[in-house]
A protein has these predicted regions:
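Polar/charged side chains located within well-ordered beta-strands of beta-rich proteins
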Residues: 29, 90-92, 110, 114, ...
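Short beta-strand edge/turn micro-motifs at domain boundaries
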Residues: 125-157
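A short, structured loop/turn motif at beta-sheet edges
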Residues: 98-108, 124, 137-143
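Generic short beta-strand segments
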Residues: 51-54, 111-119, 152-153
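Well-ordered beta-strand positions in beta-sheet-rich domains
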Residues: 97, 113, 130-134
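A solvent-exposed, acidic/Ser-Thr-rich amphipathic alpha-helical stretch
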Residues: 18, 42-106, 127-128
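Short, low-complexity N-terminal intrinsically disordered segments enriched in polar/charged residues
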Residues: 2-51, 68, 157-158
Length: 158
């Protein structure tokens, strides 16, 4: 084992606690979801997810088992959004439901609820759904990246 590898294995990431951790995760997830729903920047998304990202969805099943596959799926959706009459979505965190716990030496577990809005083309936006989520975040030298996503309890909003 090389010295550099041994040193890397011994290093642990410093995870803040309390309100500081919640603020960091809230900012990271806001950035992630803005990229995913409002943006169209696969290179940026690739920096927001881990290479071994896994996502599970109560309606779609296993969405991805790698960051690369997730980014490729996103890139395909980006192309579809370019049509003038394409459906566009927006996700909004319900801040009162947000709960963040530290995972020492690794990152944080985030859980909460969010709502989704849709619009066709430039048409009016409509609230269409609500769901719960759990996300495992990994902190590294380049910041926070999401490593695991559980998206469940999806319900239509009348």
């Amino acid at each position: 084992m090389t010295f550099a590898l041994a040193l890397a294995l011994l290093q642990t990431v410093a995870i803040p606690g309390g309100d500081a951790l919640t603020a960091e995760i809230k900012a990271a997830e806001a950035d992630l979801f803005a990229t995913f729903f409002q943006g169209c920047d696969p290179a940026r998304l690739a920096k927001q997810v881990t290479p071994d990202l896994e996502m599970y969805h109560d309606r779609e099943g296993v969405v991805t088992t790698s960051g690369e596959a997730f980014v490729a799926l996103y890139a395909k959706q980006c192309e579809a959004k370019k049509a003038p009459d394409a459906w566009r979505s927006r996700r909004e965190l319900l801040p009162e439901t947000l709960h963040v716990d530290p995972v020492p030496g690794f990152g944080a577990i985030e859980e909460g609820e969010h709502v989704f809005y849709e619009r066709k083309g430039d048409g009016p936006e409509k609230l269409v759904g609500r769901a719960r989520f759990v996300q495992l975040w990994k902190k590294g030298p380049d910041g926070w990246r999401v490593a695991r996503i559980l998206s469940f309890d999806h319900k239509a909003v009348p």
